Regions:
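Divalent metal-coordination and catalytic microenvironments
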Residues: 11, 95, 122
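Gly/Ser-rich "nucleophile elbow"/oxyanion-hole loop immediately N-terminal to the catalytic nucleophile
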Residues: 1-21
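Alpha/beta-hydrolase-fold serine-hydrolase catalytic core, especially in secreted/extracellular enzymes
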Residues: 91, 100-103, 108-160
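Sec/Tat-exported extracytoplasmic proteins
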Residues: 30, 39, 125-126
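Hydrolases whose catalytic domains are alpha/beta-hydrolase-1, hotdog thioesterase
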Residues: 22-26
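The feature captures the conserved acid-bearing segment of alpha/beta-hydrolase catalytic domains
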Residues: 33-108
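Solvent-exposed, acidic/flexible segments
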Residues: 16, 28, 59, 108-115
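Extracytoplasmic low-complexity repetitive segments enriched in small/polar residues
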Residues: 13, 64-68, 117, 128
């Protein structure tokens, strides 16, 4: 029933918490045009004992723009996400922090403040929507002017 309705050349992957790690694991797939990581990042660890097999080397294989939406320092995944951000240097990356903790505000109607920024990222990256781009890029970027959010980015200005 979905034949002809899906754009197989415009694929995004996203996930929250452990699902974000799974999204990062599949992000190097050549079909992926963008990744969105919610309250997550690849675990920081010094030993190979973890049951989670993905490690920071996976970040070297990224080929498409990636966005991290994190719940601030109170988010259990904050350190993992900020470490990922620091390591990513080959692709455009954006990190947006809203200090709501690990579960953010997903329980609010319509997903709370995280939902519209996620939609804007997808509209920009998959549809080329310039109004959506302005949420993240430019001298008066929408999130940049919102004191509730802390925004960091690298190489976003390279994107159309």
């Amino acid at each position: 029933p979905l034949e002809g309705l899906l754009a197989a050349d415009e694929v995004a992957v996203m996930g929250q918490s452990c699902g974000g790690v799974e999204a990062l694991d599949i992000s190097p797939d050549p079909l992926v045009k963008t990744s969105v990581i919610w309250n997550s990042g690849i675990h920081i660890r010094d030993t190979p004992d973890s049951r989670i097999k993905i490690n920071k080397d996976k970040l070297k294989a990224l080929h498409a723009p990636i966005a991290y939406f994190i719940g601030g320092p109170g988010d259990i995944a904050y350190a993992n996400a900020t470490d990922d951000y620091a390591r990513i240097d080959r692709v455009p990356v954006m990190m947006a922090n809203l200090p709501l903790g690990h579960m953010g505000n997903y329980n609010l109607p319509m997903g709370g403040p995280f939902a519209p920024v996620g939609v804007a990222w997808l509209d920009w990256r998959l549809k080329g929507d310039q109004k959506a781009k302005a949420v993240f890029v430019g001298p008066h970027c929408g999130l940049c002017g919102d004191p509730a959010w802390t925004i960091q980015s690298k190489r976003l200005d390279e994107l159309r």
